Regions:
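Proline- and Ser/Thr-rich low-complexity, intrinsically disordered segments
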Residues: 1-171
């Protein structure tokens, strides 16, 4: 049999090779959720156990079971750090990956998940079976620091030093 390529798919198959007995075999397959088939080879299977019964022309019977498995789900756990100052580029996005089949390849669409400025970044994960998972992260930044002039007191005489400016800031 051929197991499932990606978690949740139904592309498994079982190919029987029947030898021995007396020709004109009949095959019966049963499985989970009422699965039933009378073909020798079965396709588009989901992960499950499939029981077969083969009967030859002399009514001799052979039975057994085949298990079709699937890879674990691709899981990405995201840890992000936002930009520390407005206009900066020190945001980060780090993925901890598990599941799938073989090595998981991370693609951030040309971006490096370090030294990020504010914005939304999308990633795509691909395993050895070409199974795909994707997601995105939004990196934020604090608002810009602004100085607000609350009031101005002019100097009283030319070249004087008794003027005052009162300010407040935001951000």
């Amino acid at each position: 049999g051929y197991n499932i390529s990606c978690n949740g798919e139904n592309d498994g198959s079982i190919d029987l090779s029947i030898v021995g007995g007396t020709g004109n075999y009949t095959t019966t397959w049963t499985g989970a959720n009422g699965y039933f088939n009378v073909a020798e080879d079965i396709y588009t299977l989901s992960a499950s156990d499939y029981d077969y019964t083969i009967t030859d022309a002399n009514q001799c019977v052979n039975s057994g079971s085949v298990t079709i498995t699937e890879p674990t789900l691709i899981i990405a756990t995201l840890s992000a750090t936002n930009v520390s100052c407005n206009g900066g580029d020190n945001g980060t996005a780090i993925l901890t990956l598990s599941g799938g089949t073989g090595t998981l390849i991370e693609n951030w669409g040309g971006n490096t998940p370090m030294m990020l400025s504010s914005g939304t970044y999308t990633y795509v994960l691909t395993d050895s079976n070409l199974c795909i998972d994707s997601g995105s992260v939004t990196i934020t930044e604090p608002s810009e620091i602004t100085i607000i002039t609350d009031s101005v007191i002019d100097v009283s005489v030319y070249n004087g030093n008794d003027g005052e400016i009162y300010t407040s800031s935001n951000g």
